[in-house]
């Protein structure tokens, strides 16, 4: 829930969505009428028509100027109550890049397809933003992973991810030969197309497609999922959130690339080493409802549940039998 004082929200929007202008301006109207300021990034202002050269003109409200254009930098979300992401999971991940260093939460409104990271669908925009205006929401922290690339024991690159770090063959040709290490001990060596290190949040993303388990977000853990491995033992692993995962690329093999959430990359030369640990900072999440994760998974993935009777019906049947 928000604190007292001036309230301001940073808007991040998917520029390729036809409905984004209408949705963004609807959000601006709701917030400004409630006295809440809105920030937009300078490089997004033209596509959302929040610059002085575009129509419709920015709306105004009790807060004065409806929209404040800010530069796209690590400080863009500093001082905001939250970051509002209008789009799909990719937009949410982009918003998280700005929200995390500012330690502010992200609220995702789905304008995409699945939108597993988002909290509400576009048709429920007014209701969702109404809850924000009233401060009727809670914030939960989701663990991240910090990733480091070492070459000859020297740190050469580092980054972080909310969903996963995906280590892949840079040339896309041949097999990537790796050695997996957990907590300082070797576990297995194998050839593969790649290997993922994921969080519970990322278990419903790329890791899900690669055959990894779905992990409830309340459970903190690190997941290791080999992709198309050529080995008898190369199964998905679930480790402690405090584990230190390392993947070494053999010196005679291929150069590799580490994709962080599919958005940022680190170079892994042959003979290099990737280390992943629990992130130093979480990504903070705006939650508007308390629906069970199972319900969310069924809804987002459109899972069939026909035939489910549930405990209530079972208990009533037992009660009828007891009376007989």
From Swiss-Prot:
Name the keywords, alphabetized. ATP-binding, Cytoplasm, Kinase, NAD, NADP, Nucleotide-binding, Transferase
**UniProt-recorded Gene Ontology molecular function terms:** ATP binding; metal ion binding; NAD binding; NAD+ kinase activity
The keyword Signal belongs to this UniProt entry's keyword annotation: no
Name of the protein in its database record: NAD kinase
What is the stated purpose of this protein?
A: Involved in the regulation of the intracellular balance of NAD and NADP, and is a key enzyme in the biosynthesis of NADP. Catalyzes specifically the phosphorylation on 2'-hydroxyl of the adenosine moiety of NAD to yield NADP.
**Cellular compartment(s):** Cytoplasm
> Catalysed reaction(s)?
NAD(+) + ATP = ADP + NADP(+) + H(+)
* Gene Ontology cellular-component annotations: cytoplasm
SUPFAM superfamilies for this protein: NAD kinase/diacylglycerol kinase-like
PANTHER family in the record, alphabetically?
NAD KINASE
Family, per entry: Belongs to the NAD kinase family.
What residues form the catalytic site here? 89
Query: InterPro entries annotated for this entry?
Result: ATP-NAD_kinase_N, ATP-NAD_kinase_PpnK-typ_C, NAD/diacylglycerol_kinase_sf, NADK
Q: What is its EC number?
A: 2.7.1.23
- Organism expressing this protein natively: Nocardia farcinica (strain IFM 10152)
């Amino acid at each position: 829930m928000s604190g007292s004082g001036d309230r301001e929200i940073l808007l991040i929007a998917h520029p390729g969505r036809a409905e984004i202008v209408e949705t963004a301006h609807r959000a601006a109207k709701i917030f400004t009428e409630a006295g809440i300021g809105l920030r937009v990034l300078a490089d997004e202002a033209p596509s959302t028509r929040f610059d002085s050269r575009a129509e419709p003109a920015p709306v105004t409200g009790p807060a004065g100027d409806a929209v404040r254009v800010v530069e796209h930098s690590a400080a863009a979300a500093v001082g905001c109550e939250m970051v509002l992401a209008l789009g799909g999971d990719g937009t949410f991940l982009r918003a998280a890049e700005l929200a995390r260093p500012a330690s502010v939460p992200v609220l995702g409104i789905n304008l995409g397809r699945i939108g597993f990271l988002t909290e509400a669908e576009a048709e429920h925009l007014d209701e969702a933003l109404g809850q924000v205006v009233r401060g009727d929401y809670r914030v939960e922290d989701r663990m991240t992973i910090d990733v480091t690339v070492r070459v000859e024991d020297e740190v050469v690159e580092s980054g972080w991810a909310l969903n996963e770090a995906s280590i892949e063959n840079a040339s896309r040709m041949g097999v990537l030969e790796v050695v997996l290490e957990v907590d300082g001990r070797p576990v297995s060596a194998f050839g593969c197309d790649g290997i993922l290190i994921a969080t519970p949040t990322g278990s419903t993303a790329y890791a899900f497609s690669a055959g990894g388990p779905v992990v409830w977000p309340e459970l903190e853990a690190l997941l290791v999922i080999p992709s198309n491995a050529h080995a008898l033992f190369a199964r998905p692993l679930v480790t402690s959130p405090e584990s230190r995962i390392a993947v070494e690329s053999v010196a005679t093999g291929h150069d590799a690339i580490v994709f962080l959430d599919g958005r940022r990359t680190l170079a892994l030369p042959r003979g290099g080493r990737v280390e992943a640990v629990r992130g130093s900072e979480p990504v903070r999440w705006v939650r508007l409802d308390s629906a069970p994760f199972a319900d969310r998974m069924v809804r987002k993935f459109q899972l069939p549940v026909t035939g489910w009777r549930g405990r209530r019906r079972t208990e009533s049947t037992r009660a009828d039998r007891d009376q007989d």
